[in-house]
Amino acid sequence: MRTSRSPVRSRLAPLFTGVAALAALLVAAPAAHAADPPLRDLAAAKGKAIGTAVTGSKLTGTYGEIAGREFNWLTPGNAMKWGSVEPTRGAFDWTEADRIVDFAEAHDQDVRGHTLVWHSQNPSWLDNGTWTPAQLSQLMNDHIALEVGRYKGRLAAWDVVNEPFNEDGTYRQTLWYNGLGTDYIAQALTAARAADPAAKLYINDYNVEGVNAKSTALYNLVRDLKARGVPIDGVGLQAHLILGQVPSTLQQNIQRFADLGVDVAITELDIRMQLPATEAKLAQQRTEYDAVVKACVAVTRCTAVTVWGFTDSDSWIPDTFPGQGAATPYDENYAPKPAYHGIVTALGGTVTEPPVPAGCSAAYSVANQWNTGFTGNVTIRCAAGSSLSSWRVTWTFGAGQQIGQAWNASCTQTGATVSCANASWNGGVSSGGSVSFGFNGTWSGSNPVPTVTLG
């Protein structure tokens, strides 16, 4: 889990360059609109949920309208963490958490409680105290009983234990692990089940989206907990991802957890990029949001995808990774970005693309071919009287071809479908002009020329 960010006007000045560039891109492009039907209806038709992390104090105006319309799950970004609800021992503040739960109930939404046992954002009195194992166990169990019990019957799921592992798959050295050993996890799950038998109980972590040492440690933990009869209903894959680094084993990993007999949720999805954003980066981000959501849709026991804040104005990324951002489906002015439309298409919806000017077209050719490799070229041309300020082309290979390195364009391939968008320097195609890009690829058996769509 990651914290929600501070208001946008408090951000460091250098980041405004990237924000302004992104705004210019979105203003210059034809107007984009939210889906009709909204995301929550598209997800429901697939038997899934689509959620967002929210800040309770912002659930008014446009922010509240989008949160209520588009999503059927809400996760409190910070409001239910121990440091928020009990900053002083024995003194509780449920204002923000209650506001989110009340909003969700008014908008027919489920709530994912986040989070009960974590190494971060604990109250200082807890972190700085000296506790015996018995005292620490009692504190943890009492906290879980109090918070889960307060919302009994009102929350659908809880992230009971958050981020228990290091990157190499060893247990993170935390207050809980150091005081109670690995058994703190089973204790926490058991206490949560006792406090609300109907709520689904999850272990949640980051960098566990693909098959790796950390996700395998989580897999082994869940397998062992189930073998011991400890209540565990699901795993949360946070999915704080970097543009161009979506794990190729994401769907395989989701499936292996599902095969253990637990649900899987993508709980904190965002895909960050180096600022400034460009049309090419936004197009690639759209493809990657589409791929992540499709991986969940493909696995029956993957129940939900939650984005970690739906708007760039409420994202934790810029304050944590200076110079990076544009990670969410909506821009800072609440306009849906290409990433939003990637979610739409992954959920089976349709997107009305801006019309390509008459007289502009794209042509594919094979410039060179050898053994199992080839070089492909694509040329975008506009006849006299037509022009483009940016472009994106797609095609579907018919014989298993794969693209490799590309130049003068940003290209991604998902299955047989390839999407390429202009680089920062060649988006404009003037009246009567053309631009070209190329790539190396592989083939086997045959290498037919696909039909290219410009749009």
Locations of regions flagged by a protein language model:
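Active-site clefts of carbohydrate-active enzymes
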Residues: 115, 200-208, 239-240, 257-289, ...
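Substrate-binding cleft and catalytic face of glycoside hydrolase catalytic domains
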Residues: 39-40, 69-88, 95-210, 272
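Extracellular low-complexity, O-glycosylation-prone Ser/Thr/Pro/Gly-rich "stalks"
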Residues: 349-455
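Secretory targeting and sorting signals
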Residues: 1-34
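Boundary/entry segment of secreted carbohydrate-active catalytic domains
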Residues: 35-77
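Aromatic- and acid-rich polysaccharide-binding/catalytic face
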Residues: 72-78, 162, 195-205, 218-247, ...
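Short, acidic/polar
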Residues: 55-70, 137-147, 213-225, 250, ...
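Acidic-and-aromatic substrate-binding clefts and catalytic sites of carbohydrate-active enzymes
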Residues: 53-64, 82-95, 165-170, 208-217, ...
